[in-house]
Amino acid sequence: MPSADFPAFYLGQSAFSDPGAHLPRYAALPADPRRLARIARNVVIHRLEGPLFHHHIPTDRLHHDAETRYLDDILRLITERDPAPLTHPRAPADRFVGVCRDLALLHCSFLRHVGVPARLRCGFADYLGPDGFHADHVATEYWDERRGWLLADPQLADPRVADACRVDFDPMDVPRDRFLVAGRAWRTIRADRAAADSFGVHPPDQGPLNGEWFVAHSTRLDLAALNKVETLLWDTWGSDSTNTPHAPYDEVAHLTVGPVDLPAARRLFAEHDALRTPKTVLSLAPFNGPREVTLR
């Protein structure tokens, strides 16, 4: 299947997905994307999943694990807690306490290692929150030789999680109307086909992390991820929440919805100061407060 997405670009690891000194632990990984999703799922617990797994997550791990940007550091924590091979499922108490981005990054790293082009996509899922709400989320997009790019949600690779979310689709082939890449969400609210505050971390009656500014932020993260810059979800740069210019995000949406125009997306990311990830970002850590972080 021909593609304008240049899947070969997504075979190599990024600074964020590189296992570094832990590469030998990848030797026993299978080549099957579905099995790789389950392996990633079995070494990570989402920090909101304590009740589902009947596990009390220690406060220090709840607050600090998901601040780990780079996969080599994530793998270090996983193996310090249990030195078994990565293919060995961990007990909840021995897992890395992360978020959707961490699961997707681990899955993406595995896929790239075994020769499957893969990338992160930032956007919004309609199966993680109340009806009508699209929750901030990250999925893996991987290349299938027959069908092209498919969306996978490794968070759903554990049947307990899939059942709790009441999903009725294959987690390795997420329908694109159930997970909207950020540019599509941006287009949806710009066309008044959905309320802006129906996209975010939570609905407006639960807090302020929703709305047009938040979708713009996710659109910026998705462009960065397509350029293999897979930052934390709360790493920020560019426009603030009080001033969201439409034109840059309209352009990002044009390039990233449907077949990605990769050369144009790479050019835009390199040339647009407000869209390009700077060397130093402002990280709005949910538990630890804001701080400036210089990236590797």
Across the structure, where does each feature detected by a protein language model lie?
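Generic structural signal for short, solvent-exposed loop/turn connectors between secondary structure elements
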Residues: 31, 144-146, 296
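A eukaryote-biased signal for long
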Residues: 283-296
